């Protein structure tokens, strides 16, 4: 049991990170409708809140967080990422959030140090 707890303390736990990202999105965007003039502010708030909460976990990681907000207008979006890392310690998580007027896609990467 101690081995599991020790690895849990230094592991990238996707559910934990996903919840942090969702809370940051809800806090920054909440029930707002898409407004082009606010997108820069919203994306900045989402990534900064996410990074702040991730660092508060006190885990030995360097974090990378990206955020894309796009208006719902029928346009498509295709993205991809690739990482060369140690899959036993490093990890990533992508959260797609939406409301009636926009999509918000956040990716968080944790690199063990």
From Swiss-Prot:
GO terms for biological process, alphabetical: axon development; cardiac muscle cell apoptotic process; cell division; dendrite development; establishment of mitotic spindle orientation; intracellular protein transport; intracellular transport of viral protein in host cell; microtubule-based movement
The UniProt record lists the keyword Hydrolase: no
Pfam families: Tctex-1
Database matches in Gene3D superfamilies: Tctex-1
Region forming the signal peptide: none
Keywords: Acetylation, Cell cycle, Cell division, Cytoplasm, Cytoskeleton, Dynein, Golgi apparatus, Microtubule, Mitosis, Motor protein, Neurogenesis, Phosphoprotein, Transport
Domain of life of the source: Eukaryota
Residues with N-acetylmethionine modification: 1
Keyword 4Fe-4S in annotation: no
Effect on the protein of changing residue 94 to E: Impairs interaction with dynein intermediate chain (DYNC1I1 or DYNC1I2)
A GO term for molecular function: transmembrane transporter binding
CC per GO annotation: axonal growth cone; cytoplasm; cytoplasmic dynein complex; cytoplasmic microtubule; dynein complex; Golgi apparatus; growth cone; host cell
PTM comment text: Phosphorylated by BMPR2. The phosphorylation status is proposed to regulate the association with the cytoplasmic dynein complex and may have role in cytoplasmic dynein cargo release.
Region (Interaction with GNB1), start-end ranges: 41-113
Major localisation: Golgi
Subcellular location: Golgi apparatus; Cytoplasm; Cytoplasm, Cytoskeleton, Spindle
InterPro entries: Tctex-1-like, Tctex-1-like_sf
Family to which the UniProt record says this protein belongs: Belongs to the dynein light chain Tctex-type family.
Record note on quaternary structure: Homodimer. The cytoplasmic dynein 1 complex consists of two catalytic heavy chains (HCs) and a number of non-catalytic subunits presented by intermediate chains (ICs), light intermediate chains (LICs) and light chains (LCs); the composition seems to vary in respect to the IC, LIC and LC composition. The heavy chain homodimer serves as a scaffold for the probable homodimeric assembly of the respective non-catalytic subunits. The ICs and LICs bind directly to the HC dimer and dynein LCs assemble on the IC dimer. DYNLT1 and DYNLT3 compete for association with dynein IC (DYNC1I1 or DYNC1I2).
Task of the protein: Acts as one of several non-catalytic accessory components of the cytoplasmic dynein 1 complex that are thought to be involved in linking dynein to cargos and to adapter proteins that regulate dynein function. Cytoplasmic dynein 1 acts as a motor for the intracellular retrograde motility of vesicles and organelles along microtubules. Binds to transport cargos and is involved in apical cargo transport such as rhodopsin-bearing vesicles in polarized epithelia. Is involved in intracellular targeting of D-type retrovirus gag polyproteins to the cytoplasmic assembly site. Plays a role in neuronal morphogenesis; the function is independent of cytoplasmic dynein and seems to be coupled to regulation of the actin cytoskeleton by enhancing Rac1 activity. Required for neurite outgrowth. The function in neurogenesis may be regulated by association with a G-protein beta-gamma dimer. May function as a receptor-independent activator of heterotrimeric G-protein signaling; the activation appears to be independent of a nucleotide exchange.
Name of the featured protein: Dynein light chain Tctex-type 1
Organism, scientific name: Rattus norvegicus (Rat)
UniProt lineage: Eukaryota, Metazoa, Chordata, Craniata, Vertebrata
């Amino acid at each position: 049991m101690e081995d599991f707890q020790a690895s849990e303390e230094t592991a990238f736990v996707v559910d934990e990170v996903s919840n942090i990202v969702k809370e940051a999105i809800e806090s920054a965007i909440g029930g707002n409708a898409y407004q082009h003039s606010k997108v820069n502010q919203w994306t900045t708030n989402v990534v900064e809140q996410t990074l702040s909460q991730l660092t508060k976990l006190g885990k030995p990681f360097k974090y990378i967080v990206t955020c894309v907000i796009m208006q719902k207008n029928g346009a498509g979006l295709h993205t991809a990422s690739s990482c060369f890392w140690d899959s036993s310690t490093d990890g990533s998580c992508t959260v797609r959030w939406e409301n009636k007027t926009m999509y918000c896609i956040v990716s968080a990467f944790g690199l063990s140090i």
